[in-house]
Every structure is written in C-alpha cells, then in structure tokens.
Amino acid sequence: MPALEKNHIYRSTIEGYSSEGLGVARIDGQVVFVHDAVRGEDCDILVMKVLKNVAFGKPVLRHSTSPHRQEPDCPYYGRCGGCDFRHLDYAEELWAKRQRVQDALTRLGGSDVTVEEILGAAQPLRYRNKSQYPVSADSRVGFYRARSHQVVEVEHCLLQKPQADALAAALRQYLAQYHVPGYDETTGRGLVRHLYVRTNCKGESLVCLLVNGESLPYETELVALLRQAAPQTVGVVLGVNTRPGNAILGDRYRTLWGEDALTDVLCGRTVRLSVPSFYQVNHPQAEVLYGKALEFAGLTGTELAVDLYCGAGTITQVLARQARHVIGGEIVPEAIRDARASARRNGVENVEFLEGDAADVAAELARRQLRPDVICVDPPRKGLAPEVIASIAAMAPRRVVYVSCDPGTLGRDVKRFAELGYLARRAVAVDLFPRTRHVETVVLLSHKKPDGHINVKVEFGEGEGKVPLDNIAKRAEEYKSKERVTYKMIKEYIEAKYGFKVHTAYIAEVKRDLGLPMYDAPNAVEELKQPRKHPTAEKVEAIKDALKYFGVI
C-alpha cells in the first residue's frame, strides 16, 4: 500500500464523519480526514498533512454535491472554532451525531445495543444559556480559532443569547476606554482573562469577569457599562484566577454589584446557580435529556437512588419525584450549596447532598451499608475513573443510568462496565449542542442475566418434603439488620441533607419526646437535666426526618 504524499491530489468519496466533525474518506486504504466535506460527495482532495495512521486534506473540486450541504449562515464560520456543522443541514448533523454514538458503543464499547432515534432540538439557534468569551492579550473578545488559543473577535454569535453578545460589546468598550490589558497565556501577564455570562429563562443574566489579579481598575464604571448593555443583569461578580494555563473559573469570587447567583426553573424545579455550578447549557434540551434519564431509571417510589456528579442537583431533584430517597454527590462546594438551597426552596425533602468526588461518595455509602437500587452518573468529558466504575459495580445497583457528553469515553466506560457484569440495554442520543460536533447520550445499564436457571418446586406447610412456615419466619428474623443507628449517623445525615449541624442533646430531646430509648447517649441524657437551649422547629423536623430515614420511627 503506497503512502499518501503531501500536496498531492486524490479522488475519493466522503463516507462519514470523524469525532471532530471532519469528513472521512479512504484513499488507497488509508483514512483521510477532510475539512468542509459532506457525506456522499465525490471530491478531489488535496492532502495537506500525513501522519502515521491518518492524513488530513481539503476538497479542491467537488464532482458531486450532497443535497445536505448548505451555505454557512455565520460570517465567522471557518475562522471561529465554535461550530463544526454550519455547512450541513440539521437532518444530516443529527445523522452524524447518532452514528458517532453508535460507532463508539459498538467499536469501543463492544456493545450490541442499538442507539435509538436521536432527539433533536426544536430551536438550534441562540440556545446557550452560558457564554464564555476569552480575552486576548490585545483585548480582543470572542472565541478561539479551531484547535488553537488564538482569539477571533466575534461581535454576534448565533449560539449565544443576545444579552451575552451585548455584554461582550460592553466589555470591549471598557477595555478600550480605560486601557485595561487582556491576558496573555504565553507570558502569564495581563489582567482580564474571560467574560462569563449565565442567562435564565426570564432573560436575566449573571456576569462574571475572570481576572489575573485581585481587582479591576474602574470597577464601578465597568458595572455601569454592563448594566446598561443588559438591563436585566442581576449581578456582576469578579473571579480571581492567577493560575498559569487556560483554566477558566476562579479560585475565589467577589461580588461587585447585585447577586452572586442566578435562579432558573428546570423540569419544574427552581435551581440556584452560582458561577462554578454545573448546569446544562441548552435549557429545552436539558429537560428532554433529564426526562429520558428518569425514564431509564425506572423508578416506582420505593427505591434509593444515587446521583453522582450531581452539580447543582437538577437530576437529583428530578429523580426524587419518583424515588423514596436520593443522594447527590458533587466535588464542587459551591454547587453543593446551590443544590441544598434549591432543594429547600422547592420543598424537596427526600434528598441529601454529599460533598466529595465519586469515590468519596461511594465510600460513604459503603460505610452506611446502603445499597442503592439506581445509580445515575453524569461525569465530565473524561468519563469515569476505573475505580469509580468498580465502586458502582460493588454496590450492585439494579440499574445504572449513564449520562455522557463524550461518546469516546462513554464507549470505553461501557466496556469496563461489561467486564464487571453490567451491559448496555438502551441508548439514546440527545442534541444539546446544535451546529457543533458535541452530543449527549443516555445509556441504561443493568447486570447481565445468569447463563441458565433451574426450576425448583417448593411446597410450604407441615409434612414430609414441605418447608414449615415457622422456619421461614425464624430465619427471616435472624437476617434482620442488627446495625445500631448512632447519634453520629443522625448528625452526619442532617448535615449532608440540610447543611446545618445539630447537637447530640437536641437529638436526645426529640427522641425523648417521641418516647424512644436514649441509653446509647448517656451524656446527652445528663444534658437534658441542665438548663440549656432547645432545638428550633426546623431542627426538630430535620431530626425526625433522619429518624424516619434510618427506620427508627
């Protein structure tokens, strides 16, 4: 097989799309990724780069043009790296995304599951409720060029909300008027790194300036410009990020004006969103995604469910509608605070939130001897660590619902789950990111069925060959849990769910008032005899909730 030569032209047909949204052709048995290509087009392809296992090229002549090709509707397309599919019609984009998920599950995951029809967006424009504009060293505000960190100034983006574009224009005015320098990644110098905008369904915005320092010059004037540009802005926050590299979010935040968080309503639940909290960027499609996750969970009202990587607790509260109890885990402290606040505001009582990574949450569940019926995971693009998958399998849930934003790592993780006995049963792609290569997927996994079974006929009652019912009752009594519910367990539960602490004496007082024994905390009993404060009504209800949770009452 002769090697492809750089700067040579070859003729081939585009077969499909790569994970990066490029066309895929095969020339002399070698894979070539082709820019600005559409499936089915017969092209003369100029090879521009040749690597060991793949080459890159671009079409210089089309002998046939796909009916799915369209003129890009954005003047920045091809320079800005934000979109990948503006040269395709939406039907072809959806085909490409579903096929990408199918290929990942089949080739990488070794699964025979068929991906169901992709759930496309009714509105593929102006859908992003979170905008992140990098600022260059020469104070350009826009988006990165494809596969680089060179900023392309973009005044109007078809993916962002109009408020975000207006706020970006106000920042440009501020940088120019007050001679404030942008940040240079290569030298670590400069001040303004990113403009971050969150917008809710009502059109209100929360603005954050990420800076390489502790403050900005002319902060009052900046706030005035931003509020003038987007009058429905509810707060302006300064995020401090002095770390080298390209990380966006800050280590700490200071409110310059207004609120430090935004509220939104998703799936009928009010959600509190501070700057670091994870929240899906496409509101209508997020409701579709979470609805499908709830369907796959198959809840009946009796289950204990766990939501790992819970972010601001949106999926947790959705699951809580149909589960007995839901535990959410998240490593970002601000997100946990938002999740607890949202649950309290919504009156959702059958949830609790634990701060920590997925492994920490799994360890806490094991310590409490809790075995969830359903585990839902929604990890970042890197997917699940092997030890997290092992921990999930060790808890032996009946179902695992995997929400993924990267088909590649999803396929890898599906294979790891299969090695531990959990097979993919259903899969559906949901388009939360129209005009880009990114796609969300929901996969249902459950433990594989046994290889065979034996039919056994059992007769209950007295007599030869029958099983006495008295023996069954006796054995059942022997298998009852002997775990003692400690005051420490009750206190930890309340702190995790409600975000406040309770004194041991408060628990003892509530137990006493309920007529429960208190012999396991003699010091608390002694404290009840002394003059002291009594628990508030809120804490009494929290203690009762914990006692119900552990089956004490």
Q: Model-predicted segments: where are they?
A:
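Extended interfacial segments that mediate partner engagement and assembly in macromolecular machines
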Residues: 60-72, 78-182, 202, 216
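Phospho-regulated, low-complexity intrinsically disordered regions of nuclear gene-regulatory
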Residues: 532-553
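Rossmann-like S-adenosyl-L-methionine
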Residues: 2-8, 218-479
